[in-house]
């Protein structure tokens, strides 16, 4: 009985201790790390207050977003000490940017699809081509002043009459390039939600939501090569300088095989087969001595008949006379031997008569 009471007390004590530990953990729960996405409306720093005051702002602003020491993960320092380097100014322009008319990106290495909506004001001034706010290479053309302009133009919000009345012409006034480029788009059935608020740096869900069942207008030709999204500025082709050798193309470096044809009109394979056949025939004639002796006479009698392989008789005889061990050479040797034999027989007969 006492053992039961002791076990019951122990169980109750363990339960109370576990509950107290749980409350303690909940009370001392670590606060979530704050980023520039939190309280994003504070990221729009006025031009009069937008200046860097820390010495390491340039290096601080170049850190990647995922870096724990970046602007995104250190919002207090980004807003208070380095708003210029962290791209939080409303419309901060440098002297170089003040003359900017469009047609190219001022900071192409920092421009990307992601930057168009993470840092919208900075991207309008520095990434007009990447964000599709102007025509590439046309510096005197119109330039959009809102990164949402391509979306509004493709989905027909430029030509929506009710849209112009409700928004006081915000879209048409701020999107001259997109409204002109996508002028053939079907008008939107409903106006864009009003009021249209200005985007803030690192604002979550800054990309507008496409209306259901609506097909956007096609991209212009100078953006189609890069696919849907934000194209990169095409690199111009470098001309070949005098004295330099241009790298060969695939067609130039690999010439097509050429089949050689002899003068007789036959292919190389057929000519080789005929040469082999003629060599075998000549070898057979060399071993046959009686046939070799009669060959010159036969060749003389049949001088008008064409030689094998389509050659003329004279050409065949010339070829036979040039090769060593042929029939004329063998007949000369046999004639000399016969002449010596006859001479020896005459000498022996004359010697017998003298005796």
Curated annotation (Swiss-Prot):
SMART domains hit by this protein: ShKT
UniProt feature, compositional bias: Pro residues: 207-221
Disulfide-linked positions: 50-89, 57-82, 71-86, 116-131, 149-175, 158-179
Gene Ontology terms for molecular function: toxin activity
Broad class of where this protein is predominantly found: other
Residue span(s) of domain ShKT: 50-89, 107-134, 140-182
Keyword Disulfide bond: yes
Record GO cellular component, one term: nematocyst
Localization of this protein: Nematocyst; Secreted
Residue ranges of the region described as Disordered: 202-355
Record field: compositional bias (Basic residues): 335-355
Low complexity bias locations: 222-232, 240-270, 277-332
InterPro entries attached to this UniProt entry: ShKT_dom
Signal peptide: 1-18
Top-rank lineage group of the source organism: Eukaryota
Keywords: Cleavage on pair of basic residues, Disulfide bond, Nematocyst, Neurotoxin, Secreted, Signal, Toxin
Tissue expression profile of the protein: Nematocytes. In late planulae, transcripts are found throughout the ectoderm in nematocytes, with high concentration of expressing cells in the oral pole. In primary polyps, is expressed in nematocytes in the body wall and physa ectoderm and in the upper and lower pharynx.
Propeptide cleavage-removed residue intervals: 92-355
Function: Neurotoxin. In vivo, induces pronounced contraction and tail twitching on zebrafish larvae, as well as death 5 hours later.
Similarity comment: Belongs to the NEP3 family.
Protein's name according to its UniProt entry: Nematocyst expressed protein 3
